[in-house]
Amino acid sequence: MAKKDLFHKDIEGRLDELKHGKPKKEKASLGENLNKIFVIALGLMILIGLIFTLIGALRK
């Protein structure tokens, strides 16, 4: 193969880690953490909105 695979060394390194033992957990990036917080906050806002809507509909 004339062209080297760019990810070959990365894949081989990961395979060696898996052979030698338990792989290390990778830390979640800042973007992943912000995304998780945003999704949870959005879900809570939707739930609170639904609860208030139901309370308002039941009062009438």
Swiss-Prot record:
Location in or out of the cell: Cell membrane
Pfam families noted in UniProt: Asp4
GO cellular component: plasma membrane
Phenotype of gene-disrupted mutants: No export of mature cell wall protein GspB, a small amount of unprocessed protein is exported to the cell wall while the rest accumulates intracellularly, probably in a glycosylated form. Cells bind less well to platelets.
Keyword Nucleotidyltransferase among UniProt keywords: no
Keyword annotations of the record: Cell membrane, Membrane, Protein transport, Translocation, Transmembrane, Transmembrane helix, Transport
Assembly: Part of the accessory SecA2/SecY2 protein translocation apparatus required to export cell wall protein GspB.
Job of this protein: Part of the accessory SecA2/SecY2 system specifically required to export GspB, a serine-rich repeat cell wall protein encoded upstream in the same operon.
Name recorded for this polypeptide: Accessory secretory protein Asp4
Organism encoding this protein: Streptococcus gordonii
Species classification: Bacteria, Bacillati, Bacillota, Bacilli, Lactobacillales
Gene: asp4
